[in-house]
A protein has these predicted regions:
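Catalytic donor-sugar/metal-binding loop of nucleotide-sugar-dependent glycosyltransferases
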Residues: 67-71, 76-96
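Catalytic cores of nucleotide-enabled group-transfer and carboxylate-activating enzymes in metabolic
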Residues: 1-2, 42-46, 78-81, 117
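Nucleotide-sugar-dependent glycosyltransferase catalytic core
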Residues: 90-92, 96-115
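Conserved nucleotide-sugar donor-binding
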Residues: 35-65
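Alpha-helix capping and helix-loop boundary segments enriched in small/acidic/polar residues
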Residues: 48, 66-74, 103-107
Length: 190
């Protein structure tokens, strides 16, 4: 996946799972115009998941279905549920996407934090909950210091919802009540 605004810069070529719950984009910000970058791009790494717009898979290998509609980060969760599969990337297959920073909204911030939280909450790693809390505090501070208080509020709402237990997730699959709550706090950042 490459950036629409800067078409030679790679956003990611799949993503890597780190310590079972953290993730980061592979080959992030690699410049496809540089010869050395192309050599780096050829080096295959174990990929954990890929974005919907450039990720193909055998439908018979699917064990758990994702939502039948796009929800921010559902490709990450889908990849997490199917991380045992051997994923390969292909040079020459690409798509250009709008920079995620331009897509930030209050609802996206809520959903993004929720998506990041799920692997940490179900991880058996000793410090997963602590690292999730550090990530949460950092994101809320960044939003607050940028005067994006509605984003910060949505992240706090998401954090609390994530800790509400299984019933919350089952009762809110359609996001209907969550959208109402998000709309109620969204006045300036639409």
């Amino acid at each position: 996946m490459l950036f629409e605004d800067n078409p030679a810069i790679i956003h990611e070529s799949g993503a890597i799972w780190h310590r079972d719950f953290l993730h980061y984009p592979d080959k992030h910000y690699l410049d496809a115009r540089e010869i050395d970058s192309l050599d780096t791009f050829d080096n295959e790494r174990k990929i954990g998941y890929g974005g919907w717009w450039f990720f193909a898979f055998n439908i018979n290998a699917i064990e758990y279905y994702s939502f039948p509609f796009f929800v921010r980060g559902d490709d990450l969760l889908f990849g997490y549920m199917h991380k045992k599969h051997n994923i390969v990337t292909l040079n020459g297959v690409a798509s250009w996407q709008m920079d995620f920073e331009r897509k930030i909204s209050v609802l996206n911030s809520y959903l993004n934090f929720r998506t990041v939280a799920v692997p940490a909450l179900i991880s058996k790693r000793k410090f997963a909950a602590l690292l999730l809390s550090v990530f949460f505090v950092r994101e809320v501070f960044l939003a607050s210091f940028s005067c994006r208080y509605e984003l910060a509020r949505a992240m706090i709402m998401s954090y609390n919802d994530c800790l509400s237990g299984r019933e919350f997730w089952e009762d809110n699959v359609d996001l209907l009540e969550i959208r109402k709550r998000i709309n109620a706090i969204t006045h300036n950042e639409k």
